């Protein structure tokens, strides 16, 4: 499972290695093809605002955007991964400045918020959405479960 993290935000008070490990954990837990590749980009607020306007037609910055690459992506993989071609899952774009504000409002640290947002973005790449109330309940439940499992596996608590 290849996870590439590119920090173009200028923000450095979080652990990029841990963020990549979280992403791999989520992908593994969701039984994504082990040959899949994921890009996680962290961008400054102006870049996120531009992406939000350009791709979502919504003004202002947002916290996370997900850009799937392979439309035919299947979240499960065969027992013989060598039979599965490498899959470009997509890009998750995070904005640490927005994450910092949201973290303060939620009463936890920015790194925790980035973990929440990264998990959220990956779920979008896997086809989950929250446009309808039932979809939202399912996605949030799964997101919370994945983060709780990560906390246990990584030996961390929500911070």
UniProtKB/Swiss-Prot annotation:
Its EC number is 3.1.-.-. It is an enzyme of class 3 (hydrolase). Its cofactor is Zn(2+). One of its GO terms (cellular component) is cytoplasm. Zn(2+) binds at residues 120, 124, 130. GO terms for biological process: rRNA processing. Gene3D superfamilies: Metalloproteases ('zincins'), catalytic domain (3.40.390.30). Binds 1 zinc ion. Single strand-specific metallo-endoribonuclease involved in late-stage 70S ribosome quality control and in maturation of the 3' terminus of the 16S rRNA. Belongs to the endoribonuclease YbeY family. This is Endoribonuclease YbeY. It comes from Parafrankia sp. (strain EAN1pec).
């Amino acid at each position: 499972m290849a996870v590439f993290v590119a920090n173009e935000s200028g923000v450095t008070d979080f652990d990029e290695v841990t963020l990549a490990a979280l992403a791999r954990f989520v992908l593994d837990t969701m039984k994504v093809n082990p040959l899949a590749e994921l890009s996680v980009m962290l961008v400054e607020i102006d870049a996120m605002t531009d992406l939000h306007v350009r791709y979502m037609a919504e003004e202002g910055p947002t916290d996370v955007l997900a850009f799937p690459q392979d439309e035919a992506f299947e979240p499960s993989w065969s027992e013989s991964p060598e039979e599965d071609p490498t899959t470009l899952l997509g890009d998750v774009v995070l904005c640490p400045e927005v994450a910092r504000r949201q973290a303060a409002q939620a009463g936890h640290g920015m790194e925790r918020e980035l973990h929440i947002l990264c998990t959220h973005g990956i779920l979008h790449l896997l086809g989950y959405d929250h446009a309808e109330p039932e979809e939202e309940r399912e996605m949030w439940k799964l997101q919370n479960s994945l983060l709780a499992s990560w906390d246990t596996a990584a030996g961390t608590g929500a911070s």
